[in-house]
A protein has these predicted regions:
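A structural "domain/chain start" motif
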Residues: 1-54, 62-63, 129-135, 147-192
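A structural detector for beta-sheet-dominated domains
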Residues: 13, 18-20, 74-76, 83, ...
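Short secondary-structure boundary motifs at beta->alpha junctions and helix caps
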Residues: 28, 91-93, 108-158
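Unusually extended, aromatic-enriched hydrophobic runs near protein termini
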Residues: 49, 73-78, 96-100, 120-123, ...
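Surface-exposed short loop/turn segments
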Residues: 61-113
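Short, Lys/Arg-enriched charge-dense amphipathic segments
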Residues: 79-89, 138-145, 186-190
């Protein structure tokens, strides 16, 4: 209803990051790595939505000053915190993956932000302690867990390690297909 009041068409502007362009790959190491696959996946999901109270354009906008309202999804924070945890008299590594996003509604004509809707989540993983240190990171495992988190797909540690045997692009495509087949983005409390 709100979108009807401010305009008939809402333009999907894609995924972005809340930082300067030079800092993206450093500040959002895993999300930026996944962006090229998540962007078309989300665009396709959005284009298949029915019963919206407004027209949603997921293609390119012809002009930036035509009065169209745009919205984008911006990753604000990507953080992995670690620490040791005693679990049944065994020291393990607890990794906490935190993501915060902002849905930003933007008026192209006046070049003003109409609304920012923040949302965030976190997921925990327990791993074996290796060499009395929890600071050493497996970047592929971290990227996999960030993707699983975005897609609301739950995999055991053993399943995650099996997935790491698959080349990165193939692994991402397999999980996007699984998400699509299971409608995992419709899971309550999904980040997207």
């Amino acid at each position: 209803e709100e979108a009807k009041a401010i305009g008939e068409t809402v333009q999907w502007a894609g995924i972005s990051f809340v930082t300067s362009a030079a800092d993206v790959s450093e500040q959002f190491k895993h999300s930026s790595r996944l962006n090229k696959d998540l962007r078309p996946f989300l665009t396709k999901k959005l284009s298949s939505l029915d019963n919206l109270s407004f027209d949603l354009n997921t293609g390119n906008s012809e002009r930036s000053d035509d009065g169209t309202i745009s919205f984008l999804l911006a990753t604000d924070t990507e953080r992995i915190s670690t620490g040791k945890l005693n679990v049944n008299n065994e020291i393990r590594c607890l990794s906490i993956y935190s993501i915060s996003l902002q849905a930003i509604v933007y008026d192209q004509k006046s070049q003003s932000i109409l609304q920012i809707i923040p949302f965030a989540g976190e997921v925990n993983h327990l791993d074996p302690l290796v060499g009395n240190d929890c600071k050493k990171r497996n970047n592929d495992l971290d990227s996999l867990r960030i993707l699983l988190f975005y897609l609301s797909i739950d995999k055991s540690r053993a399943e995650q390690l099996e997935l790491l045997k698959i080349p990165f692009e193939e692994r991402v495509n397999q999980l996007l297909k699984e998400s699509n087949d299971q409608n995992s983005l419709e899971t309550p409390n999904n980040l997207f």
